[in-house]
Amino acid sequence: MRMLRDNPDNVDVRIYGTNVLRDAPALTACDVAEVEPRHVSDADYAEFALEFCRRHRIDVLIPPRRLVALAGLVDDFAAVGTRLMCSPPAAVEVLTSKSRTYEVAAEAGVPVPPWRVVSDAEGFRDAVRELSATGERICIKPAGEYSAFGFRILDDGPLRIKDLLAPPLPLASVAAVADALRRAADEDEAIPEFLVMPYLDGPEVSVDCLSAPGGATLSAIARSKQGRYRHLLDDPALTAIARRLVGHFQLAYLSNVQLRHRGGEPVLLEANPRASAGIFQTALSGVNLPWAAVRLLVSGDAGPLPAPRLGGRLAVTEIATEVDGGTPLALIERPAPAPDPVRVLAEIDTAPGAAPRARREAELLLGEETAKAG
């Protein structure tokens, strides 16, 4: 959003944003913010988006999600005065499925890793057995558009001390995953398709692309990600893969291609027909991709696109943002601890010689309580 405001044409931009969470931090950067519906059908979401744009007289809609619901409605949005920034519906439909993405990309000559689609325990075990024959570690993830939360590295090895001292990894055993699939089938639980493939553990390369309708790439900026650091890469081989994929799918405006290396060669990890969440990092290259995309959508001209400054290294840091509303975290109420039981001494005997006996009894009791505390 900052890149849109800091545009080279000095256009005063007013930003409207929606999120399913009322207190989403991103909404604090918007001039107008509203809550959007959660868990609704594509048709209902599209109706919400159209009504929002009509009510607020939105000039340009840049959807970061629910693209399948919106991609085929370019004319509907135009009817309410809004230009929709989106790639063709056919491309969006394919790219929201990782398995279909790999199939079509491989046909286009884009290098992809070996993969198998599974949805049951037997197919999963067969896929692991086949793909692990190369000696590579294997992983599993949902085959749909968003897979980060379902990603697991398969590991049947014993836990070692060095594992306990290292940052945690999303590990799961083959047996545990197979049991989960079998249990879901026995309980008639809906099972999505999963992708089984080699685990590519090198630095991820993300290529942010700007392209004209029809898929002609106008700019492609590659950056590697390792921890909190990013490198703006000057590597034509990486951007060439992204250009080929963007051209084959005829992607328009903003898209993102993610690569990793396997055996020293770059292969496709995934592709998204939308801007990446990290596109703001490309600002340090000197190219304002989001604003160029808006210009391209509105006027058909992306404007001057300087050669990106590559080779730089940057760090992604955190900032604290105040948000409105929300419910404070409640302290867990715990019952008051019960008082320790009081031991009552026998009635004090005042007879001669009773004092030493009472002292000995008290010492025994005190010794008993001390032992309990220890």
Regions found by a protein language model. Give the residues of each.
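ATP-binding N-terminal substructure of ATP-dependent carboxylate-amine bond-forming enzymes
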Residues: M1-A90, A371-K372
